């Protein structure tokens, strides 16, 4: 900006874009599964990643990742969603929390148990 522009107008404040807009500043939100399916990751990686479409309690519809090995999610299952993107899946900015509501924890998990809802 030139000096004349600064005298005439205020400087514009830069607005930070939220990384998880669908959660509306909440740490987690409850939702209902609409569709459970697998998808393939971006270029250097190869797998079948488990994801699901979730309708949140605030009527937003998002795509969320199901972490860990194996799951028991079906259509109309209740889930708890947190923020956190999956780097190699474009458009997936949310994770489902294991062992809350209808999603069970990972069976036979020994390490990092708290992240996958496995009791001791």
Swiss-Prot record:
Keyword Secreted: no
Gene3D superfamilies cross-referenced by the UniProt entry: Nucleic acid-binding proteins
Biological process terms in GO annotation: translation
Molecular functions (GO terms): rRNA binding; structural constituent of ribosome; tRNA binding
Disulfide bond sites: none
GO CC terms in record: small ribosomal subunit
CDD domains from the UniProt entry: Ribosomal_S12 (cd03368)
Residues recorded as bearing 3-methylthioaspartic acid in the entry: 88
Pfam families: Ribosom_S12_S23 (PF00164)
Alphabetical UniProt keywords: Methylation, Ribonucleoprotein, Ribosomal protein, RNA-binding, rRNA-binding, tRNA-binding
Coiled coil (residue ranges): none
Source superkingdom: Bacteria
Similarity comment: Belongs to the universal ribosomal protein uS12 family.
Protein role: With S4 and S5 plays an important role in translational accuracy.
Assembly, per entry: Part of the 30S ribosomal subunit. Contacts proteins S8 and S17. May interact with IF1 in the 30S initiation complex.
Official protein name in the record: Small ribosomal subunit protein uS12
Originating species: Carsonella ruddii (strain PV)
């Amino acid at each position: 900006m030139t000096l004349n522009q600064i005298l005439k107008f205020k400087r514009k404040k830069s607005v930070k874009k939220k990384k998880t807009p669908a959660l509306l500043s909440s740490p987690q939100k409850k939702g209902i599964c609409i569709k459970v399916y697998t998808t393939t990751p971006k270029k250097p990686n190869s797998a079948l990643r488990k994801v699901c479409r979730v309708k949140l309690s605030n009527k937003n519809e998002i795509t969320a990742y199901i972490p860990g090995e194996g799951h028991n999610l079906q259509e109309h299952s209740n889930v708890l969603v947190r923020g956190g993107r999956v780097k190699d899946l474009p458009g997936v900015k949310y994770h489902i929390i294991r062992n809350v509501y209808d999603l069970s924890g990972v069976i036979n998990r020994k390490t990092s148990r708290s992240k996958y809802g496995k009791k001791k």
